Swiss-Prot record:
Gene (UniProt): carR
Protein name (record): Carotenogenesis protein CarR
Species lineage: Bacteria, Pseudomonadati, Myxococcota, Myxococcia, Myxococcales
Induction context: By light.
N-terminal signal peptide: none
Residues annotated as transmembrane: 56-76, 79-99, 107-127, 136-156, 166-186, 191-211
Localization of this protein: Cell inner membrane
Membrane-topology annotation of the record: Multi-pass membrane protein
GO cellular component: plasma membrane
Keyword terms: Carotenoid biosynthesis, Cell inner membrane, Cell membrane, Membrane, Transmembrane, Transmembrane helix
GO biological process, one term: carotenoid biosynthetic process
Organism: Myxococcus xanthus
Amino acid sequence: MKPPMDLDSLLTQTPAKDNAALERVLAAARGELALRRPVRRWRTQAVGLMAASAGLGLLAAVVLLAVGAVTGPLLLARAPLLAMLVGTSAVCAWGALSPKGRWMRRLGVGLAVVSAAALVLARGAPHSPPSFPGWVCTVSHLAIGVVPLVVALFALRGAFFQPLRAVVAGLSVGSTGALLGELACEQDWRHVLSHHLLAWVVITVVLVVISKSLKPRSYAP
């Protein structure tokens, strides 16, 4: 019968080395280093996400103005809200990709909440009956967010998954549809709440879910 093991002596023992496992780890590390993948700076990726989200929304504004779908006076009247959405998108994009942007992520969430409330409160009674069903706005907002969604997912793979980081990236992406809604839709606050903001929430949730399921290229903070 074996004598009972002394816990103190067991804890002080040096664990046996598994040379085979160590060699496999070293081989995998050397293989990763041999790939020499180009490293993109997070600032460059943040600017790219800003361009893909807020930039795409502003491009839509220029196109709508050029084809006569939006008038100059309407654009000027909505300018404060548009500026707020662009600022929210920029702060969220920067905070999502900054390694030390925790405070900026919280600021981005706060700005998104304020912007959403402003979009609802700024809407008055519609000047004309709706010419299309409300779900058209939701679908169009989701559609215009596809490109910035892909850009955000690619950028987020450069670091390990963090829920708040993914949320603010989704809020940046969702602001694109919100910009479009302020330009192309004249319906009341109920419509904004139930269709415009719904699309913003949906695209944020989709980005968080997909980002969590993707394997990161790096485990940097």
